[in-house]
């Protein structure tokens, strides 16, 4: 009886404190009148310094808790932002921001220098691919998943001024037997798993060539329809 009473009291106190806390909640509405560059916000990110970043239809906005600062392409500014309409924003382990714009292009933003760069660089192979998803891995690797051209793996080299290199995983480049990668997952060992419409691929840390699984090939790269959409790294 004492145990039941104690549980009841704890639950009652939890309800009271929860109700009490709700009474002190408040909301602040921010708009272009407060410095936001555009009222249509597509995505919000909190970075490792607790700044809030807003992806809008007119560039990205940084909010430090007091004021907004806008970063976008302006006429006469030689910065590599192909479109001011930003749909998604992510942060990697090095503090760089990765942006997916309305024209399906990807840009890396450096908050320190406040500059953009298109990735892959304009004119390079893969720069015209239509990217629909950015996957940021815990180890700093960034994957760009395209509509019909496979996936692009972006590597950052911190000891070389954070220089970028990339590889295209696609049946067109003969590096990977698929054009459609649905998801990339990094397991506890640092292996990158690619879930595709044609089986699974796995890339070991520090390696370029993938291992393919569950793919029955008819020809060199033509395969059966074995699509994978989810993966789980179970505890041993």
Language model features with spans:
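Carboxylate-rich, polar loop motifs that coordinate divalent cations or form catalytic acidic clusters
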Residues: 1-236
């Amino acid at each position: 009886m004492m145990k039941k009473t104690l549980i009841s009291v704890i639950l009652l106190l939890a309800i009271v404190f929860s109700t009490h806390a709700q009474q002190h909640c408040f909301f602040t509405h921010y708009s272009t009148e407060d410095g936001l560059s555009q009222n249509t916000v597509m995505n919000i990110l909190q970075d490792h310094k607790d700044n809030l970043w807003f992806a809008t239809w007119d560039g990205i906005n940084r909010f430090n808790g007091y004021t907004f600062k806008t970063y976008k392409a302006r006429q006469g500014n030689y910065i590599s932002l192909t479109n001011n309409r930003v749909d998604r924003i992510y942060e990697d382990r090095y503090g760089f921001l990765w942006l997916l714009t309305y024209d399906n292009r990807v840009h890396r933003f450096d908050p320190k220098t406040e500059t953009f760069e298109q990735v892959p660089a304009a004119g390079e192979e893969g720069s015209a691919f239509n990217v629909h998803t950015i996957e940021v891995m815990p180890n700093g690797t960034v994957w760009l998943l395209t509509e019909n051209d496979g996936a692009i793996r972006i590597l950052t080299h911190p000891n070389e001024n954070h220089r970028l290199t990339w590889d295209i995983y696609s049946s067109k480049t003969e590096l990977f037997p698929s054009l459609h990668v649905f998801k990339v997952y990094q397991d506890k060992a640092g292996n990158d798993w690619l879930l595709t419409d044609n089986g699974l691929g796995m890339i070991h840390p520090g390696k370029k060539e993938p291992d393919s699984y569950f793919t029955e090939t008819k020809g060199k790269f033509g395969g059966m329809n074995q699509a994978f959409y989810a993966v789980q790294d179970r505890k041993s």
